[in-house]
């Protein structure tokens, strides 16, 4: 359905006037809890949350409580213990290391002016193909220097009309130009999308023959991939995406099932923003080698594919140990007894593994899984199960930052409190080794902001108040929890994050604001109906409808989706703009975590219903190995 025009949502003007410097801050209501040292043990706490249109149960203390009806943990100890460790033998690592050396030699062969593997008629495309291949096969971390040298060479021949296949090609080439535009942008080179104007016909349209050969299809496939790396206001990229999408869908109706058709289907479905690196690697391993439109020597393809398979499988041995550690943590804090909540620690770990499969990033993967799990438990406590008085006690206990505060809490909250308390301190110790400064105070402020935001939403539920869109989104950017799930794991990575860099990528930077806003809006469009059924009236959809009387629910969702699309282009720019002073590699981890959540909301609320797409993701990326 077409977007209504009566109530346009412009991303720069309508995002609550908060993302772009126009402030109207929401003042959170706070109630002071008197002397937490005087706990009122045994007191029956009356429910004060709205019970309309939701399910509730009577707990052991006789208090009716709201529940979400979420399915249980899908991955027990037997599932984890059954994971393969057959590739942890030293011989596999030794073979992988030899292959890494051979691939480095192959990069060297294409770096000489007229080597065995290249010529002045194809050297630019060959370099781009090598860089693209190692990235999609998930082995690029071994070839950073080689990648930089290859792209520097390509960029030195870049023109306002793009490039040809080689430095001495007589004409520009769509495939090479599109692949170059995409790859150079993602690595921080300033390249204009106007190079694509030179591939239009006299009518100003992209045009290809009706025959649709494999070579031509791959040209357009790379055009599609490039079009997704769009910045605000780039009409040519919108045109390229529209044309290439239609072309590729038409091609799928004509070509037989093959690696090419599988690749097209995958990229049309996941694009870039929901395309997780390890997930793409698993697909690309299956189809790599079938592309013969670029005549790369068989030996190069063979070595790249073998290395990719080995690295994919070797990682599985590490996965098993990390998941066993995560499962012990989950049980040690009594999480299995919290039966009313979602338990998605294995799924969160998988998502982390899909964006960070370097063995040295174990702390990142486990930290991300733990924090996401705790944030999810807290979300279910604040949104459904907890009473208002319990929530006030929990919030105040966190702000006191004293383990003795748990004596005032209901039993089901005590383990959660200690898990958060211990996790912050453990992460701080790990981070201090890398960052050289104590992050406890910094992390506590982030957690306190989350608790305040949850309390605000709990009060809205309790009172039946429906806020304005502006009020809701300003609070919702915090209550989603994406800042927390990003911040602490990031601090355990191997690169230093100074206060100056944190200001550029963490709160209150525009980069962080965009991430938080997009995730809140995207999550709401997938969750708002289920949330309303549980008695949670406030969502970006319902609040937008309140602000615009007469608009239909469908049109409100369409307007929000359009806003998300515009904000996503702004996020692309914030990630890749060359004047930020922060290396793209630093921002890329933040961005990839955003992609993780974006993927989770692609089809539904995948964190509440994890038994479909995300279950398949776990199976494909961390359970199954690939045949050598």
Swiss-Prot record:
Free-text cofactor note:
Binds 3 Mg(2+) or Mn(2+) ions per subunit.
Gene3D superfamilies, alphabetized: Farnesyl Diphosphate Synthase (1.10.600.10), Terpene synthase, N-terminal domain (1.50.10.130)
Q: According to its UniProt record, in which pathway does this protein act?
A: Terpene metabolism; oleoresin biosynthesis; Secondary metabolite biosynthesis; terpenoid biosynthesis
Return the Pfam families for the record: Terpene_synth, Terpene_synth_C
The gene designation is: TPS-mono1
Entry note about domains? The Asp-Asp-Xaa-Xaa-Asp/Glu (DDXXD/E) motif is important for the catalytic activity, presumably through binding to Mg(2+).
Q: What is this protein called?
A: Monoterpene synthase like 1, chloroplastic
Where is the protein situated, by its record's location annotation? Answer: Plastid, Chloroplast
UniProt binding sites for Mg(2+) 3: 531
Q: Which domain of life is it from?
A: Eukaryota
* Disulfide bond residue pairs: none
InterPro entries given in the database record: Isoprenoid_synthase_dom_sf, Terpene_cyclase-like_1_C, Terpene_cyclase_plant_C1, Terpene_synth_N, Terpene_synth_N_sf, Terpene_synthase-like, Terpene_synthase_metal-bd, Terpenoid_cyclase/PrenylTrfase
Keyword Chloroplast present in the record's keywords: the answer is yes
Query: What top-tier enzyme class does this entry carry?
Result: lyase
The keyword Lyase appears for this protein: yes
Q: Name one GO molecular function term.
A: terpene synthase activity
Motif DDXXD motif location, chain numbering: 379-383
Tell me the cofactors it needs.
Mg(2+); Mn(2+)
Q: Where is the signal peptide?
A: none
Q: What family does the entry list?
A: Belongs to the terpene synthase family. Tpsd subfamily.
| Function field | Monoterpene synthase (TPS) involved in the biosynthesis of monoterpene natural products included in conifer oleoresin secretions and volatile emissions; these compounds contribute to biotic and abiotic stress defense against herbivores and pathogens.
């Amino acid at each position: 359905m077409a977007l209504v025009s009566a109530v346009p949502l412009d991303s720069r003007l309508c995002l609550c006037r908060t993302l772009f410097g126009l402030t109207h801050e929401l003042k959170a209501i706070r109630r002071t809890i008197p002397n937490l040292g005087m706990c009122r043990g045994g007191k029956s706490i009356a429910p004060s949350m709205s019970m309309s249109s939701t399910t509730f149960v009577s707990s052991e203390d006789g208090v009716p409580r709201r529940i979400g009806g979420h399915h249980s943990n899908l991955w027990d100890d037997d599932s984890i213990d059954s994971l393969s460790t057959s590739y942890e033998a030293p011989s596999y690592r030794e073979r992988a290391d030899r292959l890494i050396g051979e691939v480095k030699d192959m990069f060297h062969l294409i770096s000489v002016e007229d080597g065995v593997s290249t010529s002045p008629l194809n050297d630019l495309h060959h370099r781009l193909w090598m860089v693209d291949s190692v990235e999609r096969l998930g082995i690029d971390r071994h070839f950073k220097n080689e990648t930089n040298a290859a792209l520097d060479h390509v960029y030195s021949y870049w023109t306002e009309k793009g490039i040809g296949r080689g430095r001495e090609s007589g004409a520009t080439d769509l495939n090479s130009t599109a692949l170059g535009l995409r790859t150079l942008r993602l690595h921080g080179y300033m390249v204009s999308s106007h190079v694509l104007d030179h591939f239009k016909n006299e009518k100003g349209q992209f045009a290809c023959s009706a025959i649709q050969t494999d070579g031509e299809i791959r040209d357009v496939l790379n055009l599609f991939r490039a079009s997704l790396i769009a910045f605000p206001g780039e009409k040519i990229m919108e045109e390229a995406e529209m044309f290439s999408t239609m072309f590729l869908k038409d091609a799928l109706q004509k070509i037989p099932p093959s690696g090419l058709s599988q690749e097209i289907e995958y990229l049309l479905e996941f694009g870039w923003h929901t395309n997780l690196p390890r997930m793409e690697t698993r697909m690309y391993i299956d189809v790599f080698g079938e592309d013969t439109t670029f005549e790369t020597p068989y030996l190069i393809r063979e070595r790249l594919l073998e290395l990719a398979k080995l690295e994919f499988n070797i990682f599985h041995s590490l996965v098993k140990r990390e998941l066993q550690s995560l499962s012990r943590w989950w049980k040690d804090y009594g999480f299995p007894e919290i039966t009313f909540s979602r338990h998605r620690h294995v799924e969160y770990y998988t998502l982390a593994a899909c964006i960070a499969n370097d063995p040295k990033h174990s702390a990142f993967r486990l930290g991300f899984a733990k924090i996401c799990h705790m944030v999810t438990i807290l979300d279910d406590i604040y949104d459904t199960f907890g009473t208002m008085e319990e929530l006030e006690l929990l919030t105040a206990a966190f702000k006191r930052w004293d383990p003795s505060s748990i004596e005032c809490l209901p039993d089901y909250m005590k383990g959660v409190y200690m898990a958060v308390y211990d996790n912050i301190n453990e992460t701080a110790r790990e981070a201090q080794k890398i960052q050289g400064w104590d992050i406890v105070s910094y992390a506590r402020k982030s957690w306190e902001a989350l608790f305040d935001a949850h309390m605000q939403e709990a009060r809205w539920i309790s009172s039946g108040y429906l806020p304005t869109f502006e009020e809701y989104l300003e609070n919702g950017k915090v209550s989603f929890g994406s800042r927390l799930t990003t911040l602490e794991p990031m601090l355990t990575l191997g690169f230093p994050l100074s206060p100056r860099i944190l200001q550029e990528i963490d709160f209150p930077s525009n980069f962080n604001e965009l991430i938080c806003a997009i995730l809140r809006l995207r999550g709401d469009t997938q969750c708002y109906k289920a949330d309303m059924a549980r008695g949670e009236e406030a969502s970006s959809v319902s609040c937008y409808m309140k602000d615009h009387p007469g608009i239909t629910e469908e049109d409100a969702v369409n307007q929000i989706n359009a806003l998300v699309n515009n904000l996503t282009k702004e996020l692309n720019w914030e990630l890749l703009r060359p004047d930020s002073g922060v290396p793209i590699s630093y921002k890329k981890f933040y961005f990839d975590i955003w992609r993780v959540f974006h993927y989770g909301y692609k089809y539904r609320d995948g964190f509440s219903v994890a038994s479909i797409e995300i279950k398949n993701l776990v199976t494909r990326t961390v359970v199954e190995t690939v045949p050598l």
